[in-house]
Amino acid sequence: LVGSEMCIRDRLGTVLGSVAALLFVVFIFAIYMKVFKRQMKRERNVRVSSFGYTMKILVITVIPVLLSTTIYNISGIIDQGIFKQVALLQGYTQNDIDVWWGVYTGKYKLLINVPISIASAMAASFVPVLTGAYHRDDMEAVRGQINLSTRFIMVVAFPCAVGLAVFGLPIFNILFSSTRATNAEASLMMYVGAVAVVFYSLSTLSNGLLQGIDRLKVPVINAAISIVAHVIVLILLMLIFRLNIHAVVLANTFFALLMCFMNSMALKKYSGFKQEIKKTFIIPAISSLIMGVISYIVYFILYKACHIEIIAFILAAIIAVISYAVALLLLKGLTEDELRHFPKGTLIIKVAKKCHLL
């Protein structure tokens, strides 16, 4: 029952979110309709493309993007079918299977999708600049944009992954207080699979980057290969290691990792981009680990002192943000010029200089 309720909530949330987004887009379009019409009247000597040509370009552009997204989403359906059938063959009860799957989709996936969606939005913001540079045949600017966007995403993804792994149980207890019985299982999934945030964020970004340099089919092919490998890994983990729901968590992490690797190879092939490792991955990872240790110690002390989970977590989260920023700047993970590209970058630079971090 718990698992079924979580699945229903998960699906309902997705549908309502999509409907809300659609209504918002329609609302914005309706507001700007008069502006569009005025702009169209002012235009002179404009060649209007035929409806057939426009639809052809749209279909050629949209179908690879939709296919790539569909493969990402269909992996959940495939996972559910394989997991439930294999788990039944291994002797697990239907109730256990439903609860595990409900916790996986309704708690673990729900939470890791938050930072991944942020990465997806960031990826979309980088594509127009990248596409412009590519069509100007300015490959130096293309490589610079790929490097900047990758570093930007990793600076966000690593602390999110570590934070979710460290504070999985407190977060679940705060958000899902009515189903605390399954929060320990959810936090274990998060501890095992929080690193998927990094891989999914990077694979989502690299999909957008490849589409930005007119390699629309490449992410689709890579996603198809990854989903096949993912299924094989899932079956092996369940049959040989009997990891039950944790096999799904690990297989999904593998799927994203393989996507990252293949997309990275494709970016190198088509743009000549060579990935810098130290500042992009190592320093954010070390800074995030430092953040995780410090913030967990703070949380542990505060919780022992006040026994109020939400207060201990909020204060520890504030310390986490500060400690990560300090560690990242002290380790030279970001330069002043790179910080200017961040939201409120000028303010961050002023504060960092006052604290002698830059």
Feature names for model-found ranges:
Residues 116-138:
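Helix-loop junctions and terminal segments of transmembrane helices
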Residues 5, 26-67, 269-284:
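Interhelical loop/hinge segments that connect adjacent transmembrane helices in multipass membrane
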Residues 67-115, 132, 172-180:
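Helix-terminus/linker motif at the lipid-water interface of multi-pass membrane proteins
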Residues 299-358:
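Membrane-proximal transmembrane or re-entrant/amphipathic helices at the cytosolic face
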Residues 1-7:
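Short, small-residue-biased leader/transition segments that mark boundaries at the very start
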Residues 13-26, 188-214, 218-238, 245-268, ...:
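Short runs within selected transmembrane alpha-helices of multi-pass transporters and secretion channels
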Residues 55, 59, 105, 126, ...:
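Interfacial transmembrane-helix starts/ends
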Residues 165-197:
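Interfacial segments at transmembrane-helix termini and the short loops linking adjacent helices
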